[in-house]
């Protein structure tokens, strides 16, 4: 079974007022823990789980990372909120460092205005050949993951009308978005090298494809999602992502070609996902026709169900998806919080509360659906091969 892990980016807010606080560097210096790192702006903080094979181990680690981040932030008078953009106005303070200085110099307002928080899922692959085959086959499904994660309706005090405005703000980077089919690892690396030779990206880390080969670990890194307000939703997206990767790898080994969906169509699907989330109609990844968002999410589940069943994760994935479809995404929760008094501070305080709800791995309502815990991988170090 393939290892997988989650990186989450959080907004740092004042523990009293809820306003964004530029204390990212202070939080990292307080922690002495490599699971916490700085982001482009001081108002952000990133966490990273270890790689795991068992979903319950991943959920426990994710909960520990959120707790670690919030407890450390409290030492400097801040809290962490799983908000993909800031509901309240923010004048970002850049993180110090030569790389960040170069990014700001090159990209101007696009960089200095980029207070956006995403969720990245890593899934182990055997080698670059398998990884690129996976990238080619998962691309039409990625907008569905975005729709399931949508958690950024507000931007600097304004209602954007989007379920994920982060996806719009992030799309201003020239290296961001969906890619054409690569076909081979050689073509993938040639494409990346050609982009670097334009002197637009600062380095490999700025190859912001929706999904890419990670340049440090033997993983496919899926980067399309908002940070999820609910930790359960992050676990669901990780499960679906691993299911997509394994399904794609099996198709490649069986000689099944990727769907030749035009990149422009994938981009339209991503726009719909960001605009409406799970509250409207999405483009079906196979037919590219608008369909009910819930039906499209179920189509994704059906696509990866054989793999989930083989891995013993089908019931927990189905339970998590049912929960999400019933209560809505973080975007819906944010809008509900604002509707009470029309005060964006309520959105932030509710996000802080939900972000830091106590979790014990897979939450109680899903444990009946989850398979029995398999052997522990607590001592597993480093990214393993599948």
Question: Where are these predicted regions, by residue range?
Answer:
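C-terminal accessory/tail domains of diverse enzymes
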Residues: 1-76, 92, 103, 170-386
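Surface-exposed, active-site-proximal loop segments in enzymatic domains
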Residues: 94-96
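Metal-dependent DNA replication initiation modules
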Residues: 83, 87-89, 98, 103-119, ...
């Amino acid at each position: 079974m393939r290892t997988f892990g989650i990186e989450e980016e959080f907004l740092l807010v004042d523990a009293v007022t809820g306003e964004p606080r530029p204390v990212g560097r202070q939080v990292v210096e307080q922690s002495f823990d490599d699971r916490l790192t700085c982001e482009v702006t001081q108002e952000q903080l990133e966490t990273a789980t270890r790689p795991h094979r068992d979903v319950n181990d991943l959920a426990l680690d994710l909960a520990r990372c959120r707790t670690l981040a919030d407890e450390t932030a409290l030492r400097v008078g801040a809290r962490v909120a799983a908000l993909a953009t800031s509901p309240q106005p923010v004048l970002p303070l850049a993180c110090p460092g030569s790389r960040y200085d170069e990014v700001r110099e090159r990209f101007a307002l696009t960089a200095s205005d980029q207070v956006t928080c995403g969720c990245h899922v890593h899934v182990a692959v055997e080698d670059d050949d398998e990884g690129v085959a996976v990238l080619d086959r998962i691309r039409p499904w990625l907008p569905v993951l975005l729709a399931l994660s949508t958690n950024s309706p507000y931007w600097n005090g304004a209602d954007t009308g989007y379920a994920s405005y982060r996806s719009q703000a992030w799309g201003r980077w020239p290296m961001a978005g969906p890619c054409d089919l690569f076909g081979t690892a050689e073509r993938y690396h040639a494409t990346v090298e050609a982009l670097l030779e334009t002197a637009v990206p600062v380095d490999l880390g700025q190859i912001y494809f929706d999904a890419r080969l990670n340049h440090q670990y033997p993983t496919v890194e899926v980067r399309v999602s908002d940070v999820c307000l609910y930790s359960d939703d992050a676990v669901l997206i990780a499960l679906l992502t691993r299911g997509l990767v394994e399904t794609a790898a099996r198709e490649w080994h069986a000689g099944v070609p990727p769907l030749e969906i035009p990149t422009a169509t994938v981009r339209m699907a991503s726009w719909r996902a960001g605009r409406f989330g799970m509250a409207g109609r999405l483009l079906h990844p196979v037919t590219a026709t608008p369909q009910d968002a819930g039906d499209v999410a179920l189509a994704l589940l059906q696509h990866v169900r054989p793999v989930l069943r083989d891995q013993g994760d089908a019931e927990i994935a189905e339970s998590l998806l049912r929960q999400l479809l019933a209560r809505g995404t973080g975007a819906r929760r944010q809008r509900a919080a604002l509707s009470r008094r029309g005060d964006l501070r309520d959105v932030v305080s509710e996000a802080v509360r939900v972000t830091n709800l106590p979790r014990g791995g897979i939450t109680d309502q899903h444990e009946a659906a989850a398979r029995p815990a398999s052997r522990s991988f607590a001592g597993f170090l480093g990214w393993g091969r599948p």
